[in-house]
């Protein structure tokens, strides 16, 4: 019983890690959303501006 619960939890953690990695990879190709780190290489999306002080995307 304990082993099956452990395997279930580890499976959920693995699934979460894989989905997070995929999401980060997809977003790396796109523009920066709200509160994302921005730079010359990764500009903010059209509706956001890059904060000069904090270097993240925010509302204008």
UniProtKB/Swiss-Prot annotation:
- Report the domain of life of the source organism: Eukaryota
Check the record and name the Pfam families matching this protein.
Answer: Toxin_12
Signal sequence extent: 1-21
Q: Which GO terms describe its cellular component?
A: extracellular region
Q: In which tissues does this protein get expressed?
A: Expressed by the venom gland.
Q: Which residues form the propeptide?
A: 22-29
Report the function annotation for this chain: Inhibits sodium channels Nav1.7/SCN9A and potassium channels Kv11.1/KCNH2. Also binds the voltage-sensor domain of the potassium channel KvAP (from the archaeon Aeropyrum pernix) with very slow apparent binding kinetics and affects channel gating. Reaches its target by dynamically partitioning into anionic or zwitterionic headgroup lipid membranes. May bind to the open state of KvAP.
Identify this protein by name: U1-theraphotoxin-Agm3a
Q: What organism does the record attribute this protein to? A: Acanthoscurria gomesiana
């Amino acid at each position: 019983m304990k082993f099956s619960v452990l395997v279930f939890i580890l499976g959920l953690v693995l699934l979460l890690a894989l989905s997070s990695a995929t999401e980060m990879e997809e977003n790396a190709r796109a523009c920066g959303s709200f509160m994302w780190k921005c730079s010359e290489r990764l500009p903010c999306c059209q509706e956001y501006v890059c904060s000069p002080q904090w270097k993240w995307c925010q509302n204008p």
